[in-house]
Structures are given as C-alpha cells and as structure tokens.
Amino acid sequence: MRQSRRASSRVNRLVVIFIIVASGFLLLYKNTQQFTQIDRECIQDEWQENNNLGNTIDDGSNFRIAFTDIQQNYTWLHLPNFLENSEILMIVSSNCDNFARRNILRKTWMNPENSQIIGDGRMKALFLVGINGADEKLNAVVLEEAKVFGDMIVIDLEDNYLNLSYKTISLLLYSISKTKSPNLIGKIDEDVLFYPDQLTPLINDKTINTSTFSIYGEKYEAGVAVNHGEDNAKWQISKNSFKCSVYPSYLSGPTYFLTRKAAKRIVEATKHRKFISVDVEDVFITGLLAGDVGIKKNQLPFMYMIEEATNDRESYEILAWHTKKRDQQYIEAFESLKLNRCKSCRKSKNPDLEELKEK
C-alpha cells in the first residue's frame, strides 16, 4: 500500500514538473511570436519618404507640425523667459483648466525647497498648456496665470485627447528650438508623483547618458496588439492610419525622458508618418517615430506608470509614479514618500507645503 502511494506521489510530481516545463516552453513560444519579421516589415512599410513635404518647424511666434497626411499651424501664445543654465528641462503636459493641480505641483516637486536639482539650477520645470476654444474667459485666466508665474508655455492648440500627439510634438519642438542648454528633456503628466532628485545618481552613473540618441522610461516590449475596432473599445486606430496588427517597443506616456539629440531626430521624423489621432501618443512618439530614426529605448528603474504597480506602503524607491490621487492625497503622499522612498531627496521640510496641507 505504501509502495503504491509512493509511486502515485512520484507520478504526481512528474506531472507537475511536466506542466511547469510545458508552460515555460509555451510562454517562451508566445513571447517569440509576439513580434515577427512580418510585423517589423509592416511597420517599416508605413514609413513614407515625403521629400517634398516641409518639416515640423518653429517660425518664431508660430510653428508648424507636419505629418504625412495632415499639417497644422499653431501659435506660441505665451513663452516664459528661459535662462540658459539648466541641463535638464522637465515639461508638464497640463490641461488648461487644471489651475489647482498646477499650484500643487509648484508647491511639491517643482519647488526648489523640495528638489535640490531644481534649487541648484540643474533642472528647469515648466508647464505646457493649450486652450479651450469655447471659453475665452478661461483662456484669458490661463494667460494671466502664465504671466504671473512665468513657468508656462501656452499654445493655441485645443486641449483634448485627440490632440495629445500634437501637444507632445509641440513640447519637443519648444525644447529644441526655444532653449539651448538642456541636454535632457522630460515629458511628464500632471498626475504623476515625481522626485526629480532621483535623476541625479542615474545621470552621474551614466544610466542616463545624455550624449547618446536615447529615450528612457518604463519600457513595453514589441508585440502589444493594435485595437482596430474589433472590441468596440473607446480608443481605436483605423487601418488607414496604421494598418499593422502590433506595435513596436515603446515607453509609457505619463513620464519619459529624451536626450536632446533624440528629441531633435523625432521632431524631424514626423513628416514620414500619418497622424494617429487617439490616446496612443506614447506609442506613436516613443515607439514608431523613435524607432524610425534609430533611437535607443531604455528601461529606467523606479518607474511605476500603472497605478497598481506600487502603493504608499511598499519600500521600493520611487522616481515617478502615475497615480490617481486627488490634490490633497497627492500632497500627503509626496511628503510621506519623500522621507522613505527617495534616497536622493533633501530632508528639509518646506513651510509652504506644510501651510498648503493645513488648508
């Protein structure tokens, strides 16, 4: 009886081992099949020469963004005074009506008292804001805010999801045409909890190498499926805009960093692709355009671009966390996590932040 049980136990172990090994091979097979040579050729085939089409360009007070199938002209409504002494430029993509969140960011990570890299002048932080075409009073308030704080770029682009790719290209164009000193450019959304001082060791140890053609952030490997409308989801891409079934590798959109060299190449590459007018600007810019011009895509540590990827109670370091925290929660999380999840942060408390928390 015991021998029978032992034999049965051995068989069960062998079955478990077989299942584990088979699952491993199946997973490996799936991963190797996600992005094939056919997929790569499809993406390359979408690229168009367009030698007769003008580039995306800054004309001084106006600028032009050119894609293969559509070209748009915009105006710089307000430009901040930029002192050429910062090597890093962070630009927050901000909705025009989010006055409260901009003030929260000014009091938290954008404040020199909270970020030594900003206090030392090594980093400059600005907002990029569009307009609301149906609300002239709101636009007037935005322009007044820009004059008062001096940290806003305002353009006459309608602030909505369909224009995200235009807005990000505008961000990159400003960075390479209106400034000279920054050799690292960061694009960040206003709902990201960010600790700028965490960049210092990453730059110092060459994890981020500003002399290369590179982008850095949370990387998704090639093979993510394209939604061509099969499941009636909110965000779909027509096959006329992009016919391929999967995307190349790309960086998650809420926060990523580009060397100046990479940003320049990406801006120059826009005219070679059709405009994709849905909320996949990260794929479009860091995946397709960056891939077209040979930009290296790099994974950075301490990046959490999915809300569930981390929480307030874990012990991992944080550089950037895309979180849904409301204004008061954002302030509290920034202050508490600064103490235990940001080794590079200054330890001094900010009296302005304490006052804001009390309100």
UniProtKB/Swiss-Prot annotation:
Gene Ontology annotations of biological process type: protein O-linked glycosylation; response to toxic substance
Compartments, record wording: Golgi apparatus membrane
Keyword Glycosyltransferase: yes
EC number: 2.4.1.-
Observed phenotype of the null mutant: Worms exhibit resistance to the Cry5B toxin produced by Bacillus thuringiensis. This is thought to be due to mutants having reduced population of glycolipids which are targeted by the Cry5B protein.
GO MF assignments: acetylglucosaminyltransferase activity; glycosyltransferase activity
Keywords recorded for this protein, A-Z: Glycoprotein, Glycosyltransferase, Golgi apparatus, Insecticide resistance, Membrane, Signal-anchor, Transferase, Transmembrane, Transmembrane helix
Enzyme class at the top of the EC tree: transferase
Protein's job: Transfers N-acetylgalactosamine onto carbohydrate substrates. Involved in susceptibility to pore-forming crystal toxins in conjunction with bre-1, bre-3, bre-4, and bre-5. Involved in resistance to the nematotoxic C.cinerea galectin Cgl2.
PANTHER family given in the database record: BETA-1,3-GALACTOSYLTRANSFERASE BRE-2-RELATED (PTHR11214:SF391), BETA-1,3-N-ACETYLGLUCOSAMINYLTRANSFERASE (PTHR11214)
Annotated family: Belongs to the glycosyltransferase 31 family.
Protein name: Beta-1,3-galactosyltransferase bre-2
Organism placement in taxonomy: Eukaryota, Metazoa, Ecdysozoa, Nematoda, Chromadorea
